Design a protein with these regions (language model features):
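Sec/Tat signal peptide C-region and signal peptidase I cleavage site
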Residues: 20-24
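Bacterial N-terminal signal peptides
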Residues: 11-17
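Ligand-binding pocket segment of bilobal, Venus flytrap-like solute-binding proteins
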Residues: 66, 156-242
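Periplasmic-binding protein-like
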Residues: 99-107, 217-266
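Bacterial N-terminal signal peptides that target proteins for export
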Residues: 1-8
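Conserved small/polar residues in nucleotide/adenosyl-binding loops
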Residues: 267-274
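N-terminal segment of the mature folded domain
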Residues: 25-134, 138, 192-196, 202-212, ...
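Extracytoplasmic ligand-binding site segments that recognize negatively charged/polar headgroups
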Residues: 104-108, 114-193
């Protein structure tokens, strides 16, 4: 999508959030997912530069952002986990839930190994069942699982896929779960930071955090292919998502050939009466 189209989309979103026409004098605030924070920051910068409103977005996590929106302390919330009917009912001023962008969730790791994970092995890693890299076909070394410590839509999407991958997964799904092992960190940036600075660490992060010492594992899909979390592989996964009447949808283990198996849509939830 080019900058002009992005600006048009975001002008529409912020117009809903403001409940009126928008201009450079308009100031809006949003809070939520860290997953799309990088692209949102860029889009909001481009929007302001083109004469649109100034938007302050705080990447506090999907759970905190949703609460802030329900409590009416921000103009819009953002999440990688769409709002359900029970949460929508709490928004007395109404809302319009809009899927804005999609992305993949990578198994990011810091170790000298060309890592390929079957779906069963991926679940075992996330469950804290694997303690040494040799169990994954790599040279021996301590493996440190790294996870989110805050309420996170990334965690919700990740655990949805883990549950779809294998019956070995017993932690359930949600924006937070009781991890039996590992190191917790706040936000995608926090998890990526732990992995970056801890040789032998592995965890789940937005694909945009795959850089430096943080490499992405190739993950097995339902076609038996081992796929990296590329834009193309993510698009193939998201093409299979069917949206409901609230524009919400998910596909925790896509069947398409070439699809990366952990991908999700990212939503904003402005209010038309704010």
């Amino acid at each position: 999508m080019n900058i002009a189209k992005k600006a048009l989309v975001f002008t529409s979103v912020v117009a809903i959030a403001a409940g009126t026409s928008v201009s450079a004098k308009t100031r809006l605030s949003g809070a939520g997912a860290s997953f799309p924070a990088k692209i949102y920051t860029r889009w909001f910068f481009d929007l302001a530069k083109s004469g649109g409103p100034r938007v302050n977005y705080q990447a506090v996590g999907s759970g905190s952002g949703r609460k802030a929106f329900i409590d009416q302390t921000v103009n819009f919330g953002a999440s990688d986990d769409p709002m359900k009917d029970k949460d929508i009912a709490k928004v007395t001023r109404g809302l319009v839930q809009i899927p804005m962008v999609g992305g993949t969730i990578a198994f990011g790791y810091n170790y000298d190994c060309d890592l390929k994970l079957s779906q069963e092995k991926a679940v075992q890693v996330a469950m804290g069942m694997i303690k040494d890299w040799k169990e994954l076909g790599c040279k021996p070394g301590k493996l440190t699982w790294t996870h989110r410590s805050d309420g996170s839509g990334t965690t919700k999407a990740f655990t949805n896929s883990m549950e779809a991958f294998s019956k070995t997964w017993t932690l359930g799904t949600g924006k937070s779960v009781k991890w039996p092992a590992g190191v917790g960190a706040k936000g995608n940036s926090g998890v990526a930071g732990v992995i970056q600075n801890t040789p032998g660490a592995i965890g789940y992060v937005n694909q945009s955090y795959i850089k430096g010492n943080v490499k992405a594992a190739a993950l097995q899909n339902l076609s038996g292919e081992y796929v990296k979390p590329t834009v193309e592989a993510g698009a193939k996964a998201l093409n299979g998502v069917t949206l409901d009447e609230n524009l919400a949808g998910q596909n925790p283990n896509p069947t398409a050939k070439g699809a990366y198996p952990i991908a999700c849509l990212l939503y904003t939830s402005p209010s038309p009466r704010d």
